[in-house]
Amino acid sequence: MVDYFDYNSLLTRAREQLPEEVFKDVRFEIPSADSFVEGNRTIIKNFKDIAKFMERDAQEFAKYVMKELGTAGDIEGVRLILQGKFGWRMVNEKIQNYVNEYVLCPECGKPDTKIVKEGRIHFLKCTACGAMKPVKTL
């Protein structure tokens, strides 16, 4: 004898077997900056990892962070060393501002973007939806 199931019960059963991550809308979560203050300097230990995760050049990213914090700094290995004392909240806020301005697509909200230069203007080009938005040069 053959058992017949209705569509809704099959769909419910299939959804229950899927992991929780499938239902999350956000797939792009920036790792928080692992920063600490040492003397009169702030050190971000995982700076290059964050830049690699965003698929952006570490030098350009560092330039943005230093400009936003109004300080000087250097990249040494995988760390960014900033002159001055900055709390982890402020550092993470500046990183999130960078993501919103230079990584996430303004149309679809996906992180699949590249910064391309056409003439003298830099654009944030989305590889997912094809949208282009002019961005400030760093």
From Swiss-Prot:
List UniProt keywords, sorted A-Z.
Initiation factor, Protein biosynthesis
What Gene3D superfamilies does UniProt report for this protein, alphabetically?
Answer: 3.30.30.170
Keyword check for Protein biosynthesis: yes
- The superkingdom listed in its UniProt entry is Archaea
Q: Which GO terms describe its molecular function?
A: translation initiation factor activity
What the entry lists under InterPro entries is as follows: IF2/IF5 (IPR045196), TIF2_bsu_arc (IPR004458), Transl_init_fac_IF2/IF5_dom (IPR002735), Transl_init_fac_IF2/IF5_N (IPR016189), Transl_init_fac_IF2/IF5_Zn-bd (IPR016190)
Q: What does this protein do?
A: eIF-2 functions in the early steps of protein synthesis by forming a ternary complex with GTP and initiator tRNA.
Family, per entry: Belongs to the eIF-2-beta/eIF-5 family.
What interactions and quaternary structure are annotated?
Heterotrimer composed of an alpha, a beta and a gamma chain.
- List the protein's name: Translation initiation factor 2 subunit beta
Source organism of this protein record: Methanococcus maripaludis (strain C5 / ATCC BAA-1333)
Gene for this chain = eif2b
